[in-house]
């Protein structure tokens, strides 16, 4: 009997090809379109209506059933509330990571199983491998598109039910497959930005949910060089949008955000990309999650990323205790950002990671 796979279909080319490949591999395939955001569903910023139309057109083309489900309540409670909480505390969260572990691979997975699915699948660029009774999350073959960073919070139960049909393909190959199959999404551009913000200005969006609290921009020595609009709008290493380019007595080098003093509501800035305050030897992380269900060895050489699309950086886990980890890098890392995730790898295997609380 054919295994039934419930495929998350977003209306984009990747999930379209994922569904097509699974159908060709002999699975019974059902597409499931998720709606995760409702507050201001304007076509300009959140094109969910068009995405559903596109997903339906693809499902019709390849001859599969498409269902739709609304997870906006779950998204608001499990992802968006944390997003606002983190920004209020001066950190820079990554809601896509929480969306994966709480919505796409929890709420979606539960719904997929309720629909009688044996497995679920998405168009993520990653791979799953079973080895010695454990499921491993592997990097995709296309290193420029690998999304394992966003999936590091998945667990054994989730991975055991998940297929990533695109993990061994390059992006250009996926476009070619879509064109050859005549899929309506073959030329559709990739979506960018946080899913619920879309293409809209970030400050405009955030100010609707959190109060603005303007304050001073200062150098580490305490010199006032400008005014900020609210600490929540800025992140470590930020260069654009500071409004202090022509500050008097400046040495002509660009300004970068180097810290936030939450108690005084002061934004700390420095000049020069390689200023010492922007270069870090390591970090402390909490909220740890290890995919295998057990901690990795300490004082062992791994690699880690502290942001998406960053090259892997050699590191050691110096300490693991009380739910926190201290990670030291072989060479200095630039603008490590509290609230972002550090994700640890051993070769192409994603081991897990945690949320950065501070840089060292």
UniProtKB/Swiss-Prot annotation:
Xref: InterPro entries: MnmA-like, MnmA-like_C, MnmA-like_central, MnmA-like_central_sf, Rossmann-like_a/b/a_fold
Disulfide bonding pattern of the chain: 99-195
Keywords: ATP-binding, Cytoplasm, Disulfide bond, Nucleotide-binding, RNA-binding, Transferase, tRNA processing, tRNA-binding
CDD domains hit by this protein: MnmA_TRMU-like (cd01998)
CC annotations in GO: cytoplasm
Keyword S-adenosyl-L-methionine: no
Coiled-coil regions, chain positions: none
Site, as annotated: Interaction with tRNA: 124, 340
Region (Interaction with tRNA): 145-147, 307-308
Predominant place of localization: cytoplasm
GO BP field: tRNA wobble position uridine thiolation
The protein's Enzyme Commission number: 2.8.1.13
Region Interaction with target base in tRNA, residue ranges: 94-96
Single Gene Ontology MF annotation: tRNA binding
Protein localization: Cytoplasm
Gene3D superfamilies given in the database record: Adenine nucleotide alpha hydrolases-like domains, HUPs, Translation factors
Active site: 99, 195
Reaction(s) catalysed by this chain's protein: S-sulfanyl-L-cysteinyl-[protein] + uridine(34) in tRNA + AH2 + ATP = 2-thiouridine(34) in tRNA + L-cysteinyl-[protein] + A + AMP + diphosphate + H(+)
Residues given in the record as ATP binding sites: 8-15, 34, 123
Functional note: Catalyzes the 2-thiolation of uridine at the wobble position (U34) of tRNA, leading to the formation of s(2)U34.
Family matches, as PANTHER family: MITOCHONDRIAL TRNA-SPECIFIC 2-THIOURIDYLASE 1, TRNA 5-METHYLAMINOMETHYL-2-THIOURIDYLATE -METHYLTRANSFERASE
Family: Belongs to the MnmA/TRMU family.
Protein name (database record): tRNA-specific 2-thiouridylase MnmA
Designated gene of the protein: mnmA
